[in-house]
């Protein structure tokens, strides 16, 4: 059974750290971060959908996507991958397109194998300053959004883990 998401805003004033455990093996949890077809099923807060424009998941590669808000507003996003260690870690620089939203934050996701087909992820967002973190929380609801995104990921993995595993095994 997946536990509730936790969010740490206290240990570092420039960081936001989300944690959640999942009833799914580590390789599967990692895999749903590596395919835009699966990312589209869970990425973002409640009510959001995601359209991938380009996806190149390798060190130095870029994922460009649009998050469509429930209010009809579109949010351009750009992720540049800095480090990928399969089944263990993904680190990237995340922000909007430079001419639209210049904020850039470093994000690191660590995948911990808890045994028994359980995985914990720790998702850390490091902002350039405490003021920038507070601005992103105030303007975008990033704190609530992180918790909702982790919950959507848990729901996606729980919906049919065996079907998801079969889809990855067959390349769908």
Language model features by range: what are they?
Residues 29, 39, 63-65, 81, ...:
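Hydrophobic pocket/interface hotspot
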Residues 62-96:
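Helix-adjacent hinge/juxtasegments
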Residues 97-147:
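Beta-strand/loop substructures that line and gate deep hydrophobic ligand-binding cavities in soluble
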Residues 1-49, 172:
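Hydrophobic ligand-binding cavity/cleft-lining segments
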Residues 17-18, 37-74, 165-172:
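Short beta-edge strand/loop motif at the mouth of beta-sheet-based domains
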Residues 13-19, 50, 62, 76, ...:
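Intrinsic-disorder/low-complexity, polar/charged segments enriched in Ser/Thr/Lys/Arg/Asp/Glu/Gln
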Residues 26, 57-58, 82-88, 110-120:
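A short, structured loop/turn motif at beta-sheet edges
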Residues 20, 52-55, 77-83, 94, ...:
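Hydrophobic/aromatic beta-strand elements that line small-molecule binding cavities or substrate pockets
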